[in-house]
Amino acid sequence: TIRGEECSAYWPAGTAAFHVNADIAMAFERYRVVSGDDSIEKECGLAVLVETARMWLSLGHHDRYGRWRIDGVTGPDEYTAVVRDNIFTNLMAAANLRSAVGACTRHPEAARDLGVDNEETAAWRDAADAVYIPYDRELGVHPQCEGFTTLREWDFTENTKYPLLLHEPYVRLYPAQVIKQADLVLAMQWQSHAFTPEQKARNVDYYERRTTRDSSLSACTQAVMCADVGHLELAHDYAYEAAL
């Protein structure tokens, strides 16, 4: 937290996890789409979408090639913190920005009351359209964040005490390809349109070998994506784990 009592065990795993703002924004958008009910959006959702969009624009920047990038964030994987261009964060931020534009279009008077003008919504749209998504062409996979696939491999045969956060210092976890919970895999579930079926399959295979089961939040997403790419036995195992 910025105000009040701190509740995160370690600030890079808490304060830098800006993606939570986009997660909440998505909840408003999905409720509207599924229910067809615009009333909650008008009452409070619009303000959430506008203020989170403003936050994303303050965090991101266009580089010299015109790509919109976000630095210094932590994605869902808390074993990889304060990184550049976490794909889950970037895609969710872009979706948040587009949702804010749509909400302001649906409720123009309420948007004006919040100080939103055409110039601001155009900036949101430009950022979303230019969002940078890293890709490792040599390996044929998406790095969870910029440079992730070049980090040292984690020795899973030697480090067998789980959860790792209770047995290993972060100074060992952060520079390695070891993942607490679904991150890039979660991006493929929540922002499925951004990946081809072939990319999904290669990404699932790559990240499955590097993901611990240190978070109960992960199994349901891994079940969905394993089923999506045809790993049905593994999907069943994860679904069973998620139900426990």
Q: Where are each of the predicted segments found?
A:
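Generic, ordered loop/turn and secondary-structure boundary motif
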Residues: 19, 41-42, 69-71, 80, ...
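Acidic/histidine-rich catalytic neighborhood
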Residues: 4-8, 55-119
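Aromatic-rich carbohydrate-recognition surfaces in CAZymes
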Residues: 1-59, 89-90, 97-100, 104
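Acidic side chains
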Residues: 23, 37, 77-78, 85, ...
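Beta-strand segments within the central parallel beta-sheet cores of soluble alpha/beta enzyme folds
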Residues: 41-50, 68-73, 114-115, 237-241
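Carbohydrate-binding/catalytic loop surfaces
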Residues: 1-13, 67-86, 142-156, 170-171, ...
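Active-site core of glycosidic bond-cleaving carbohydrate-active enzymes
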Residues: 17, 26, 30-33, 43, ...
